[in-house]
């Protein structure tokens, strides 16, 4: 609900979502605006007029046009692990982040969330967990994105709004980082 609220407040011209749950986040956004959904998995034709779907693998560059708003919530940690019909690729999450950043126009926003913990880890047949600061070191993020907001859920399930990455407990095992980036350069 937090990211749906942030998108509503920002009111972008176009919003694309990458692989988030249709029965959760996507439905929340579709209740008040059009949302384009892109996923590697097929989706049955939506009966909701605000949901537009395209099947695509974001580990590969896609010609979706530029957008001023993009979300990828609890999905990037699965890229390249083969769990959702995608090919096995140890670098799948990095390719995915690069391709997400390339879809965003200058001054556009990217909302991305994933599991956070004290170390970068791969959990077999499940997902990755990232140190909260790892994404800041990704070349595409370093080159053209600026973190404008960070929220997180801790191991107890408590939501912490508008915090610093340094506020995450160093012993966190399985929290959720929610990052809002703004694109500063066209790449």
Regions found by a protein language model. Give the residues of each.
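A short acidic, Gly/Pro-enriched loop at the edge of an enzyme's catalytic core
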Residues: 60-71
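Conserved SAM-binding strand-loop segment of SAM-dependent methyltransferases
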Residues: 49-60
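A short, well-structured juxtamembrane/interface segment
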Residues: 1-11
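A short helix->loop->beta-strand "cap" motif at the edges of active sites that frequently abuts
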Residues: 12, 32-33, 107-108
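Conserved class I S-adenosyl-L-methionine
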Residues: 10-21
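Conserved SAM-binding loop of SAM-dependent methyltransferases across substrates and taxa
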Residues: 21-32
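Conserved SAM-binding motif I beta-strand of class I
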Residues: 34-40
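S-adenosyl-L-methionine-dependent methyltransferase catalytic module, highlighting the catalytic core
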Residues: 71, 78-186
């Amino acid at each position: 609900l937090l990211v749906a609220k942030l998108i509503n407040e920002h009111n972008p011209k176009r919003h694309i979502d990458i692989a988030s749950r249709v029965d959760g986040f996507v439905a929340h956004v579709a209740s008040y605006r059009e949302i384009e959904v892109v996923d590697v998995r097929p989706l049955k034709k939506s009966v909701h007029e605000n949901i537009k779907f395209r099947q695509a693998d974001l580990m590969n560059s896609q010609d979706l046009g530029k957008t001023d708003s993009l979300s990828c919530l609890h999905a990037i940690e699965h890229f390249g692990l083969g769990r959702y019909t995608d090919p096995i690729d140890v670098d799948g999450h990095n390719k995915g982040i690069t391709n997400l950043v390339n879809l965003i126009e200058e001054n556009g926003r990217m909302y991305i969330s994933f599991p956070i913990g004290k170390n970068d880890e791969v959990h077999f047949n499940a997902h990755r967990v990232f140190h909260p600061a790892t994404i800041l070191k990704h070349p595409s993020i370093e080159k053209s994105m600026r973190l404008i907001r960070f929220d997180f859920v801790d191991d107890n399930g408590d939501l912490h709004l508008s915090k610093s990455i340094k506020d995450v407990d160093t012993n966190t095992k399985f929290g959720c980082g929610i990052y809002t980036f703004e694109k500063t350069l066209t790449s």
